[in-house]
Amino acid sequence: MSNVPTELKYTASHEWVRAEENGVFCVGITDHAQSLLGDMVFVDLPEVGAHIDTGAECAVAESVKAASDIYSPLAGEIVAINGSLEEAPEQVNAAPYDEGWLFRIRADDPAEFAALLSAEGYLAALDE
């Protein structure tokens, strides 16, 4: 069974979102997603300062098995990326909810966060 922390929100496309301060949200891929992809070899992240729409492709995770698009769960401006993934993409596998985070986004509408899936909703989506 995948690790699905209850304090996070999720998307059906396997991104997780953590609320931080001042309308900023941290985004990564779920434990389920990283386990399906296998060992990460490269992560292509969005540009800091870029504006991303909800559901837009904004990053790519490349593993030994496949390359997978990552979609923004919220609309907003990219305010930070996890630059350590350039040298150590395996952090996405080892700690997808901590050191393996991908980017931080300042949401245009922080209320979008409430509409994302709860841990229970995400687990139910996995079972479908």
Curated annotation (Swiss-Prot):
PROSITE patterns: BIOTINYL_LIPOYL (PS50968), LIPOYL (PS00189). Binds 1 lipoyl cofactor covalently. Its cofactor is (R)-lipoate. Signal peptide: none annotated. The modification N6-lipoyllysine is found at K65. Pfam families: GCV_H. One of its GO terms (biological process) is glycine decarboxylation via glycine cleavage system. It comes from the Bacteria. Keywords: Lipoyl. GO terms for cellular component: cytosol; glycine cleavage complex. Gene3D superfamilies: 2.40.50.100. Residues 24-106 form the Lipoyl-binding domain. The glycine cleavage system catalyzes the degradation of glycine. The H protein shuttles the methylamine group of glycine from the P protein to the T protein. PANTHER family: GLYCINE CLEAVAGE SYSTEM H PROTEIN (PTHR11715), GLYCINE CLEAVAGE SYSTEM H PROTEIN-RELATED (PTHR11715:SF3). Belongs to the GcvH family. The glycine cleavage system is composed of four proteins: P, T, L and H. This is Glycine cleavage system H protein. It comes from Edwardsiella ictaluri (strain 93-146).
